[in-house]
Amino acid sequence: MGCDNARIDARLANTISCAICAPLASAAGRSTRALERIGVASAFTHPVVPVALAIAMGRSRVSLPLVAVGIAASVLPDLDIVGLRLGVPYGSDFGHRGFSHSLVFAAAIAVLATLGAARWHASRAGTFMFVFLSCASHGFLDMLTTAGWGVEYFWPFSTHRYFLPVRVIDSSSLSIARFFQVTGGRVLHSELLWVWVPCLSAAFIVRAIRKSNAR
């Protein structure tokens, strides 16, 4: 009798486990497939903007700690993928490329960063502008990509999703496995051509002009 009860309990536990885990596994599978279809500029490229700004402005105006804050701000908007994992619809204001990619969000992050201006060895105004441009550049670069939905760049004043008229950056999948197995080389080549080279070239030109004028 004890053995029969044990077998019944085991079957019951297995049934309950399947009932709970199957929907979760299905949701996880749908989430993973959705991430594979989403297009963004890659996490390797968003930090190029704050690095280029730092090169152009020089160490006297942009300290290494502030550069680190700018790099963090440049990739921060893509934390909205956590919402996708939790079931937030892509097209929602709180979905991917929603409010976190807006100018208002960038301004809010920049204001928060000014609280640590002394720690970054920078003025509050300098901290605000550097972090704002670093974070706002994320949505701008995403508007240059060739796939996915547009960007709610002007949220909350407009929930329209925008792309720029010219879209030249090959989109990166948010799936890490797919990025390294399928799209990575093509995406990085595109970003090198359209983001890295222009940004860094402009940065070194501005730096050279500043040094020339300082003599």
Which residues does each predicted region cover?
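N-terminal membrane-targeting hydrophobic helices
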Residues: 14-20, 25-215
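Short hydrophobic alpha-helical segments enriched in small aliphatic residues
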Residues: 4-6, 10, 19-22
